[in-house]
Amino acid sequence: MDAQEEAEITILEISYLGGFVKYDLHTKGGNVDVVRSYYKYENGNMKREVIGNYQAEYWNYTEEGYLMFSGVWFSVELYVLTLSGAEEHTALRVQPLDETYRELSRKYLNPISFERNNMFIVDWSEEDFGDLNFYDMYDILYPKVNGQYAPYVADDNLSVSAVYQIPKEEFESVIMKYFNIDSETLQSKTIYDSENLTYEYKPRGFEEVEYPEYPYSEVVGFTENNDGTITLTANVVFPYAGDSKVYAHEVVVRPLENGRVQYVSNRIIPSEDNYRETWHTPRLTLEEWEELYGGE
């Protein structure tokens, strides 16, 4: 592309929905044109569902082995519904990643990921949990423990913040299944009512929503430690930003019986190239909440 020569390539990306995406890329004069087609297997035949095209506004092959490109694509079906195009941010791994690394990512990192939590954003450990937000962790871990979403939802009236009192045993049974933390420490990191033995819980409100584009962590190395824990080294890949290494971090996990796991620590690896976590919106502080809702 840098030489502005003419070339073309076709790339197939398997979809988790049961079909695949076909990218026909053509470059000439320094520009890259993309034709994007989605195919679905139906009634014994492969059927093309959607086709769209765009000129890539961003294009890069990264040191981490990713082909990343983005642009605004148009299709007849989409235009009928929205009268506009849709942004697409594509990250295709070209260099193969060891299957062991992929499995470690699927097993330990993907279940937490980056949506509405700061577990892989801040430094913390079992000795000092730092700024790890246990209310966000409760939201994420509750379905894994109980098989359904937590019943503590936001108020229908956006001007009112719902406040719940969760029984001590209920709150701790979720958190302590994935963290080696005692009651006293957990209470110091939350709002705890010692008289009623409950944890105060406020679901995320309108001011705490996030733009629904998130990165993912990809294991690129690991060490099995003598104490039975595993140290995972991972890169944060953010297709929306066209960045295959927003930053690198180390996550220590403790595998337990029956496929269970405890999360031991997270550490951001310092680098001048680290990029800030633009996707994350933290929960309101107590002062911010009081200012917005007047303590109601």
Language model features with spans:
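Mature, Sec-exported extracytoplasmic domains of Gram-positive
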Residues: M1-E296
